[in-house]
Amino acid sequence: MKARVIIMLKDGVLDPQGEAIKQALTSLEYNKVNSVRQGKVIDLELNESSEEAAIDSIQEMCEKLLANTVIENYEIKLL
């Protein structure tokens, strides 16, 4: 079973990498970009028997390792 985890900084958390990207885009004359938020995408392939078991397992991975839940939110998508 394949899954994708999308990890983004929570609203209100400063995103210096996103701001650096925005400034670089502006310097390249992409002046219509109002803001940029950078995140992470992690693709996983699991040996789970059910979608529910896969989601439970991935949630545990996110809580323990993949995401810093103090400042990041994550979204799980089964592919």
PLM features per residue range, with description:
Residues 7-9, 43-49:
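Short beta-strand-to-loop capping motifs
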Residues 2-4, 8-39, 54-55, 59-79:
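Long, contiguous binding/interaction regions
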